[in-house]
């Protein structure tokens, strides 16, 4: 574990030297992990980052073949509504116009977390275990990718059941979802402008499907690009520090919204909604740590949530939070 200044300087040092490394940064940036890839053998960490991995595919064969069974025990709507109302009041008063409200849901699942890692399908996956933490995630969301001096980010906001007739048209024309997506795109453009120049939106509001064990979801995404400022070219630690927490999992305006999240959620998010990624000596790939299961003692909890705006309906947001509790094993 590294302290905040340490992880920034360590990442900057590794970048200047072209040293390959993995990073796992928690939401509060209190317990960041930055490790050379050559050091990973001594840690219980497995990753799959857009095709880059540190394990043998055949290892999944050691687990028994069985059908996934997951039971959700979500909080009551009344508990959710109390938190939602606090967010809505702040938005009515102009303190925030987008806030990502999250909860942890107790679940019962017949797979271990490491088994979930090996058997799940996702663009980004991570299994992590140490003396205090054990979690697995299977995230569809890119944080930033850096290639040849260009940064790309792909904010995801807007979700619908893909099996609904006309789902894509409904999603793209939903006033609340469109407003939420536009807000997070604008927020991430602003975040990129801190570390980049020539920031532009290459693609706005396109959709893609993700598979779950309950069916398919359709999500709305955009692509934003910028060129890294020359003074930050070999300072990945500073780039990440200036952009965290990820805009898509907090809201806007960022500073005020972070305070409202703190007073509303009443618990630390920890590694959930942080970021992780890999630097290969030249380029960087990273993901937002969502679709997240953690184990505390004998109990498992699934973390999920969604963006709240003035257009939000509490029951729909509650249902979306529960709908996002899935494991992509099929």
Regions found by a protein language model. Name each.
Residues 1-330:
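Extended alpha-helical targeting/anchoring segments
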